Design a protein with these regions (language model features):
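Bacterial N-terminal signal peptides that target proteins for export
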Residues: 3-18
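A solvent-exposed, acidic/Ser-Thr-rich amphipathic alpha-helical stretch
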Residues: 58, 72-124
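Conserved short-loop catalytic and cofactor-binding motifs
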Residues: 63, 87-90, 147
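Residues at alpha-helix boundaries and the short loops/turns that link adjacent helices
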Residues: 66-69, 89, 172
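A beta-strand edge to alpha-helix "cap/lid" segment located at domain peripheries
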Residues: 34-52, 100-186
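Bacterial N-terminal signal peptides
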Residues: 14-28
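Residue-level detector of alpha-helical transmembrane segments in integral membrane proteins
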Residues: 5, 21-22, 104
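Short, low-complexity N-terminal intrinsically disordered segments enriched in polar/charged residues
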Residues: 33-77, 81, 185
Length: 186
């Protein structure tokens, strides 16, 4: 006796596997958690629920990886649509457009710009990150063209995370060191 099914059981499973493979293949490589920067040191306050901590860490890792790669998709994923820069530098546009423009400017001057997350601290709805930037000034910044000099400076950011995205950012960069390395100040 033979039993016939109106459809093959293997066909739906094959379709699911094929669909999943397509989705993974279409994702930008750095959008997968395994491809994001890991902090060298991570401290999470004991009173932060695990699910909340994971979402906050993911947003901060995406944003750190954006600074490391220049991948605008990561910034758009990490930042809330109504993102506010609370320490907005003069001339920088408010909102998501601000960091995108800043990254483009930095990469025009320092094409091999690399960022590490040295420390990350999660407390309440805040994440504090200590970033370390390195590269070589081989491009142009304002009217100055680099001659390959090394760039090595730090920044510290405080993010307020809302619904898994960075809603606000307070940041300070060691701009004096950066400007000296660029040869713009003595």
């Amino acid at each position: 006796m033979s039993i016939h099914f109106p459809f093959s059981i293997a066909r739906p499973i094959t379709r699911v596997i094929a669909a999943a493979a397509c989705v993974v293949a279409l994702l930008p490589a750095a959008s997968r958690a395994a491809d994001l920067l890991d902090p060298r040191s991570l401290t999470v306050a004991a009173d932060v629920p695990a699910k909340q901590a994971r979402a906050q860490i993911l947003a901060a890792r995406r944003y750190g990886t954006f600074w490391n790669t220049g991948d605008a998709t990561l910034a758009r994923t990490a930042l809330a649509a109504d993102f506010v820069d609370r320490t907005l530098p003069a001339g920088r546009e408010q909102g998501v457009a601000g960091p995108l423009a800043a990254s483009s400017t930095m990469r025009a001057a320092i094409p091999d710009l690399h960022c590490d997350i040295e420390q990350m601290i999660v407390a309440g709805d805040r994440v504090v990150v200590h970033l370390h930037f390195r590269g070589h000034f081989t491009g142009t910044f304002n009217a100055t063209t680099g001659s390959g000099q090394s760039i090595d400076f730090i920044a510290t950011d405080i993010y307020r995370i809302d619904h898994g995205r960075i809603a606000e950012n307070w940041h300070i960069e060691d701009n004096l060191t950066l400007m000296r390395q660029l040869g713009l100040v003595g």
